Amino acid sequence: MLEPINVSLESLNLITLAPMLIAIAGGLIILILDLLNEKLHKSLYVMLTVLVLFINFGSVLGLNVNERGFFDVMLIDGISIISQLMIIGGSMIFIPLALTSKRFHEYSYPEFFALFLFMIAGFQFMVASDNLILIFVGLETASLSLYTLIALHNRSNSYEAAVKYFTMGALAAAFFAMGSAVIYALTGSVELYKVAEVMATRLNETGLMIAIFGSSVLLLVSFAFKLSLFPFHTWAPDVYEGASAPLAGYMSVVPKIAAFVVSIRLFGMYIDLGIEWVRWTILIIAVLTMTLANIMALVQNDVKRMLAYSSISHAGFIMAALALDTTEGNTSIFLYYALFMFTNLGAFAMLWISRHKKRRFDDRYDHPYEKFAGLIQIMPMGAVVMGLFMFSLA
């Protein structure tokens, strides 16, 4: 006879789930309000989203460090808290753009804000867990929402961008699932701290090292796709070009924060175990990404595509710090990305401010360089701010 399973409230510790539940509840409330009354002013949904983000921000600040919850699959540590605050902070900068007079039409859909909050919850699950299954669930929740947000821009190249992103995202998810399956087959666990313990006792086994090699390659490819690292970066410029300028800026920053945190946990585990080839592979990818992305940025005819390649090169810089696997290196990643978040979101916001309804300068691109010629005469303050953002990114 099966013995009953005893579940204690202490092992649940649902307070660790509070930030994600707040975001999910906010998204459901927006959908319910739209079902009850379709004539509500759309600004209400913007303000409601901002309110949910503020509450979410406060709930993260109230979490205790070094705590586990929900049957030990949730992990609240310093990295988890700071990354959640950065994700919510970047979202709070992005959402108020919907209140301006030059907002894009997708900001008129209540579904946009509901999906946005579901995406935030997915990112938070990714950074607040060291359980491979929950990381995968968070990854797919966020990705599926983001694909839809891109398509809501409702232009032919937006649909193309969404399909490209979906295809590449599905491929990355498949690599992640296969890599995780290999790890589970080797160790019998999906919790990274348990995986590390089992691997540490079996590192001398030849067969195990071959399997570790396979799992690490699969996971490296998966996150190279997600972080748009060389040579898996080709989708990023097309997707950024098809998305609205503010959303492209958001995509270049916030989703990558979540992916970098998971990379710190995963590849830090391999490096801590003394598997040095993982470190050197990351460093080689970082150098190639930094170099080739900057070269490609030089030959672009569109400012948005140039900024897309710039974002790719910045990901290479962060991967170099990740390969160090030190407290100082991880601290520098968050400091670097906090500054990068403001400058990159600002640069993409300037593209949005200077947009035109029709392509006046180029039939192919929305933001050709010719569009910004003489900007100092038309919009002096905007030109100065744009210059500051560009110099900051250099």
Tell where the protein language model's regions lie, with residue ranges.
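Alpha-helical transmembrane segments of multi-pass membrane proteins predominantly involved
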Residues: 1-394
